[in-house]
């Protein structure tokens, strides 16, 4: 997952078949009523439909593209050692909701977040691999552990951080990667003539989400529960 990636409609139309082959290789069934299967439907035949897509259909297409691309790209970089963890993640994606505004107890989007985050790290030449609790980074001083948490409810931030603390403490040192996307303030598409406006709006959005809990984060950091926090947030823009 690199910056400024351009994906053609031709590539998107091939995504469902590629993902089906990956699931078959790992002996995983894709149910016809799953959100993952709906991602396939959004991408199939898109070359012939692209000029007649409504805005809601375009949004569904982009969300489907993101899920399928995360699976395909992560599959292309995993090692033999990571196959078991990868199999678990794609099983979660198939079994759970992928709707951004439909939080669940164990959301499939958190598995997508993990697949995206490890690609983000490897793109930046970090020696990262899928492993407990979610991602393991190889460093000169030993393994460094990352706990990935999608915040489905703002009421559960403390619980998620406490769980991450336990997971990291069992293994040594690490940090928490938080995904705040379920609480994005922009429904639909952010429209602007200046790309920088999107970045500034997202920065304000992330800061407003972080600020009310800053004291709690600081207390946990001061207690040595983990070494830091990263926050992911993004939106569709035109």
Q: Residue spans of the language-model regions?
A:
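Conserved catalytic cores of phosphodiester-cleaving nucleases, focusing on short active-site segments
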Residues: 135-137, 141-154
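A short acidic/basic microdomain associated with nuclease active sites
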Residues: 118-141
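Short, solvent-exposed loop/turn segments at secondary-structure junctions
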Residues: 128, 151, 183
């Amino acid at each position: 997952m690199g910056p400024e990636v351009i994906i053609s409609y031709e590539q998107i139309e091939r995504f469902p078949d590629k993902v089906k082959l990956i699931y078959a290789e790992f002996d995983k069934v894709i149910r016809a009523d799953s959100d993952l299967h709906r991602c396939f439907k959004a991408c199939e035949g898109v070359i012939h439909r692209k000029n007649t897509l409504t805005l809601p259909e375009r949004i569904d297409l982009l969300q489907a593209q993101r899920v399928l691309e995360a699976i395909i790209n992560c599959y292309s970089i995993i090692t033999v050692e990571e196959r078991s963890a990868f199999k678990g993640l794609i099983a979660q994606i198939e079994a759970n909701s992928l709707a951004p505004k439909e939080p669940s107890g164990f959301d499939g989007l958190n598995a997508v977040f993990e697949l995206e985050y490890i690609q983000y790290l490897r793109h930046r030449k970090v020696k990262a691999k899928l492993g407990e609790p979610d991602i393991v980074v190889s460093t000169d001083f030993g393994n460094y552990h990352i706990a990935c948490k999608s915040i489905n409810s703002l009421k559960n931030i403390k619980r998620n951080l406490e769980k991450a603390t336990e997971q990291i403490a069992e293994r040594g040192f690490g940090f928490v990667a938080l995904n705040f996307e379920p609480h994005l303030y922009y429904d639909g598409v952010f429209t602007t003539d200046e790309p920088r406006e999107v970045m500034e709006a997202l920065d304000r959005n992330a800061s407003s989400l972080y600020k009310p809990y800053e004291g709690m984060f600081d207390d946990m950091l001061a207690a040595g529960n983990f070494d830091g926090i990263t926050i992911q947030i993004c939106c569709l823009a035109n």
